[in-house]
């Protein structure tokens, strides 16, 4: 669904003028008063009335032909493509808008086409190296507890009240972001929570988007690769751009490089700080305690009339690292007008798909934790919090590493996991164009000498082997054995070659296999 229900109609002429005013327009042809009702950049999903963006290094004229056949009324391209695309404009009668940068145009035009849906929907953006998804789900859970509906754009799922699907990249391209916000307005959702990746900030996917609240969780050295960000500086600067058009900035005082983050956040109209054991923060937590697979803490700074002890908050999710995520969600909720009762209820009833999902065997001997952890920071927090919750338990970890990106993980992950693991099983995980066996061998090469490990490529066989080992080899009569299934969470797609192939999720495998006690 592309179409906004409002009275204002955007025309090709309006878009040409907007590009011109912003100094982006180089040339235009066949501009007139035709209505533009949507935006697209993928020739396979074009609706009649769309403006089509010709983007990408490998753009072919055939893509534009498809878009025009599907009813696109105008297209935007850079000068390098004019020679090959101009004949198509002549032939079809579509308007051609030639710009300096298609990326900039993709950030400028959609808000106009969809008639500024951000005026009717409160938008919260969350960035950080780890915790974005959890914080986003926490905030969504709080908003639902307050009786409101809330849209979500994130790495696990995207749901705007009209479209709902499993995501393949954290932040979609600008035209999609704006379509989702427009869908929120159409379906009556008052707010939208967005995970904002550094890639999205770098490539202008949210450049023109005014965040009501922009949250900064943390910064780590994870996404440094030739494909993503060549240097830490590039990555960090990209992340800081979330504050460029924020009304309120929320900053975790526990992040590395906090002074630079606060300096960047000072451009916002209002600054809210959070922190664990940071009494100088606007909202802070003290006395964090683990209660089984839940967490309690005392919250300070939320209510003017609170007692010395603060408000007691219960988080229905394990991992004390989640307290920072909760504080960000609490701060954002307060900024969009949600009270303490809904905050408490939303956090206690929380479920985050694929994050610290606990599956327990009927006889209590095996506890499986399914988690999306797939980088150094998230491995470190996950393993240390499992060890704190179950100090006497043997631990078996099943994981791999994604193909074609972040090479350094193949060294880091086994090193992070080894001190806590009794057995590591390396399995296939989103190999893309690499040989999964090669990836697993590289992981195995970096295991410190004394930690048992094996390679079982097939994920189902690996999970089966982990449960068998948990019952037969790695047993402590006084404590359950913990099996960690890492990286895939509840995802039902595996990235193989150029395809996303359907698979059974780790969560489903855990539920199906945990009570098997007879092994051949």
Annotated model-derived regions:
Residues 83-89, 186-187, 202, 212-368, ...:
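Acidic, Mg2+-coordinating active-site environments of NTP-dependent enzymes
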Residues 57-58, 198-199, 220-223, 255-256, ...:
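Short glycine-rich anion-binding loops that position phosphate/pyrophosphate groups of nucleotides
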Residues 104-253, 257-269, 390:
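Phosphate-binding loop of NTP-binding sites
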Residues 62-63, 203, 224-231, 406-408, ...:
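Glycine/threonine-rich flexible loop motifs
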């Amino acid at each position: 669904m592309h179409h906004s229900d409002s009275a204002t109609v955007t025309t090709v002429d309006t878009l040409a003028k907007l590009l011109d005013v912003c100094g982006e327009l180089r040339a235009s042809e066949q501009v007139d008063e035709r209505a533009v009702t949507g935006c697209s950049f993928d020739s396979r999903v074009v609706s009649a009335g769309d403006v089509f963006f010709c983007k990408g290094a490998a753009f072919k004229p055939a893509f534009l032909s498809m878009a025009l056949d599907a009813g696109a009324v105008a297209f935007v391209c850079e000068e390098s493509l004019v020679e090959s695309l101009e004949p198509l404009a002549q032939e079809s009668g579509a308007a051609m808008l030639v710009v300096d940068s298609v990326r900039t145009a993709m950030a400028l035009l959609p808000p106009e086409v969809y008639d500024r849906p951000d005026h009717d929907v409160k938008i919260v953006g969350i960035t950080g190296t780890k915790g974005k998804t959890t914080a986003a789900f926490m905030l969504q859970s709080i908003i639902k507890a307050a009786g409101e509906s809330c849209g979500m754009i994130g790495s696990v799922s995207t749901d705007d009240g009209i479209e709902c699907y499993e995501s393949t990249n954290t932040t979609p391209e600008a035209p999609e972001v704006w379509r989702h916000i427009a869908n929120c307005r159409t379906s009556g959702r008052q707010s939208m929570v967005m995970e904002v990746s550094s890639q999205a900030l770098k490539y202008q996917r949210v450049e023109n988007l005014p965040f009501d609240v922009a949250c900064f969780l943390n910064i780590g050295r994870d996404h440094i690769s030739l494909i993503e960000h060549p240097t830490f500086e590039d990555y960090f600067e990209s992340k800081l751009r979330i504050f460029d058009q924020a009304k309120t900035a929320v900053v975790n005082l526990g992040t590395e490089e906090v002074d630079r983050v606060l300096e960047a956040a000072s451009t916002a109209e209002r600054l809210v700080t959070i922190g664990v054991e940071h009494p100088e923060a606007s909202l802070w937590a003290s006395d964090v305690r683990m209660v089984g697979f839940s967490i309690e803490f005392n919250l300070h700074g939320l209510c003017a009339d609170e007692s010395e002890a603060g408000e007691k908050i219960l988080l229905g999710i394990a991992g004390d690292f989640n307290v920072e995520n909760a504080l960000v969600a609490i701060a954002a909720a307060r900024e969009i007008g949600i009270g303490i009762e809904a905050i408490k209820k939303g956090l206690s009833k929380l479920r985050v798909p694929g994050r610290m999902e606990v599956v327990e065997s009927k006889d209590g001997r095996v506890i499986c934790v399914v988690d999306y952890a797939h980088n150094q920071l998230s491995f470190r927090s996950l393993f240390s919090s499992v060890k704190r919750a179950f100090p006497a338990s043997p631990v078996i970890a099943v994981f791999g590493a994604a193909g074609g990106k972040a090479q350094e993980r193949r060294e880091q992950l086994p090193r992070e996991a080894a001190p806590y693991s009794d057995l590591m099983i390396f399995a296939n995980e989103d190999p893309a164009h690499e040989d999964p066996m090669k990836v697993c061998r590289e992981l195995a090469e970096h295991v410190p000498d004394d930690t048992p490990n094996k390679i079982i490529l097939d994920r189902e066989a690996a999970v089966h082997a982990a449960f068998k080992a948990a019952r037969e080899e790695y047993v402590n009569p006084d404590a359950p054995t913990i099996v960690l299934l890492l990286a895939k969470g509840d995802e039902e797609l595996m990235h193989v070659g150029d395809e996303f192939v359907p698979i059974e999720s780790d969560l489903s495998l855990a539920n199906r296999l945990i009570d098997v006690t007879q092994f051949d």
